[in-house]
Amino acid sequence: MHFDHIDYSNKYIQEILYIIRLGIQKRNKLCRNKREVLNTQSLVDTFNMIGVTMCETLIGAQKEHEREDGRGKEDIYFYLNDDSYTRIFFAEAKRLPKYKTESEEEYVVGKSSTNNPSGGIERYKLGIHGNKNLRNNGMLAFIENKSVKEWLQIVNNKITKEFPQDSPLILTDNTNEYTSVHTYVNHEGVFTMYHFWIDLSLTR
């Protein structure tokens, strides 16, 4: 089965944002001491329930979109309920701070144990995540220490340092929700990132 069938129209973006916002509001199973993959799975289960029962368009959500080219996989993908399981939105989840650290982050840039790029925004810019023709992508952050304000300053300072041509995260009308605009590294064009930050600093 072909799993890289993508709808580039971006016409479902508002429904997807609704699903994510509502899913985060129902985040009763998320906590700081859980592994990132378990918190992500809990969110995905909620996103999927909302997408197939509460939206005009049937939109599913699953973990780990496997690419046919084997270059990488996103933590979360949203898809249409059609014969091709058409992908319409990708999202990457990151812990703040990085696992087993107090202040490091891989939200903007980073290196994996095999010296490959591991930063969330970085991987979208390189085309490892997302698709150059799909101009809207997502990031979720699980805030486990410090305040949202402190992490916002850290992340925006890193964007300014590493990618001065890109915009910082800008607060929307929704709490802990941001947008930013980025250029691609290897080809022309820009894309918008939708950021959803979930404060788990007071949970156990």
For the regions a protein language model found, what residue spans apply to each?
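Conserved catalytic cores of phosphodiester-cleaving nucleases, focusing on short active-site segments
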Residues: I76, F89-P97, Y124
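Acidic-basic catalytic patches of nuclease active cores, encompassing PD-(D/E)XK
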Residues: I6-Q62
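Active-site metal-binding core of divalent-cation-utilizing nuclease and nuclease-like domains
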Residues: E56-F89
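Short, flexible loop/turn elements at secondary-structure junctions
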Residues: L80-D82, A93-P97, I128, I143, ...
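Short, well-structured alpha-helical interface segments that form or flank functional binding sites
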Residues: K34, L38, S42, R71, ...
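Acidic, metal/cofactor-coordinating or nucleic-acid-engaging core segments within structured domains
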Residues: E102-N176
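Non-catalytic C-terminal interaction segments of nucleic acid-processing enzymes
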Residues: N156-R204
